[in-house]
């Protein structure tokens, strides 16, 4: 990341190759001592020939604190995740939602800080499958924003030193009764950097653990 010859497009491509390789080599999730297939939607292409699911884990969005700057008359992020990270040196977008090169949906902007943390995806998944104490996991029923249907989520959180990474899967079942798990659908994963998100996940984990 501190390479003086840093090239943004090359870095994005290399990050995408890591993403593809990991899900090519790791197709199962071990939940309650049973291995289940992982499914991932890579057909919904969004930008630069890469799927929306990839851009979601490598970008910032409204959930990261967008507000309207009344002086500059534009939307801005309240916190830059890379402010104390070397990725800030190489970022050409600077979280500027008005940059014409951005073609992501839903007020999202590519984030090389989150891209630089892509290796945590593999680390966290491997540790979860190994039942490592470095992993906290919990399940939570949520309502889909699009369909308004209830869904059950599995959230996996990896923390070590300055690393704080979360992965989310949706439970999929063999039939409508939802009595038997058939697979897990990968939803998203990202480095956590803001206190609000950290506290929300802390609360969810404590609430789940108290009922276990």
How does the language model describe each region?
Residues 1-212:
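Ribonuclease/tRNase effector modules and their secretory precursors
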């Amino acid at each position: 990341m501190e390479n003086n010859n840093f090239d943004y497009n090359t870095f994005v491509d290399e990050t995408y190759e890591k993403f593809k390789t990991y899900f090519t080599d790791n197709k199962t999730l071990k939940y309650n001592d049973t291995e289940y297939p992982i499914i991932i939607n890579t057909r919904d292409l969004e930008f630069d020939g890469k799927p929306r699911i990839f851009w979601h884990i490598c970008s910032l969005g409204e959930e990261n604190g967008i507000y309207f700057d009344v002086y500059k008359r534009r939307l801005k992020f309240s916190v830059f995740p890379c402010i104390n990270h070397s990725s800030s040196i190489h970022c050409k977008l600077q979280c500027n939602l008005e940059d014409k090169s951005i073609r992501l949906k839903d007020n999202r902007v590519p984030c090389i800080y989150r891209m630089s943390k892509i290796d945590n995806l593999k680390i966290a998944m491997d540790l979860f499958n190994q039942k490592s104490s470095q992993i906290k996991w919990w399940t939570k029923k949520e309502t889909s924003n699009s369909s308004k249907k209830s869904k059950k989520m599995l959230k996996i959180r990896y923390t070590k030193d300055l690393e704080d990474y979360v992965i989310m899967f949706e439970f999929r079942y063999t039939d409508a009764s939802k009595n038997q798990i058939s697979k897990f659908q990968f939803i998203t994963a990202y480095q956590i950097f803001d206190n609000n998100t950290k506290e929300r996940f802390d609360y969810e984990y404590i609430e789940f653990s108290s009922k276990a």
